[in-house]
């Protein structure tokens, strides 16, 4: 019996459009609710969300069996956290602040068992192998691991042609918030200069033959980035959905 099929990776590699939701509230209930609503993927945010390993595991369980695929964003691309998140059962990881092809290759190596990488071997003890109930897990896990690297500085954007061609990198995701800050336009994600850099980045990623992703909360942004070759878009977040609903409800009350 092989490792579970990663349908998100298959979709990404085939060029199929994938729309997803950011989960930052660290809530299994929210994850379960989001997973039942037809998004292609939900990302559990371990970088900015208040997520530790037990909370990440709870949300992975909540998404298991749902039609939505789970992604975990780790705080940084260190071996120990990638190993533990993969052992928890995540098959797709997003690693922030990757700036060079060398860093990207290092991330891929940390996610793969030998001989392709150096992921620590403890699969018999963990959820990823259904606690050793998947006999061929170790031999088949590598092909089901999906690696997404996040580029979010000017240095990284200039290095996209090399980063995107690293074997084992399946998707390059542009982070507009940190990118805008790095360019001197803090919190101005739609500044014209920022959009020019993102547009070139999206085209460079697509030209390398891997999935190009970014954040696109508005229909206008979604159309723009799809037109630039984007196939992997974050279209909302649990926090913004909840906040906007609260504000709309309060506004409606004030009008009565």
Task: State the predicted function of each range.
Residues 1-256:
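Expand to "…catalyze enediolate/carbanion chemistry for C-C bond making/breaking, isomerization
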